[in-house]
């Protein structure tokens, strides 16, 4: 949540570059050269017109400000994730590619099951997401978050029908339930691991974990 509009809610928008640089440096201190530093870029927290009052150029500029700071700090990968609005996702991808063309851009959206198939809460289908993200310049496409690893297998299979790009899947450990005031994710490591073969069979190229998972 390092975009300027989100930070502005806390009076920190003037420190957008500083905060994003600090995040990258913290990762570098932790992992050194043993791992890639991936910059997670989520929704900016504002709605584009006509659903909200944000102009596309203003949203693009906010993403550009963030991606420029991340690139200058030496991030290895941009991971644009948990997107619901395809138009916003495309602006984020475009800003990353135009800021630093040599840095790979991974772009994932979050889908829910409906009687008509999988859609984001803004009504974007997997087919439209795959085409739109590729058109914007994403190097890798896919899905993150979601309802369960089981459903992610279905989402991955649907994505592969509509793209030849490398695919990234990062599932939550199911939907959380509250127990004694604490959010508990129901899927066990064994359950999630048991779905890996199915995800690989669906031609997923990069596997990760979302909320409720650990390294």
Where are these regions (language model features)?
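Domain-level signal for soluble alpha/beta catalytic cores
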Residues: 1-215
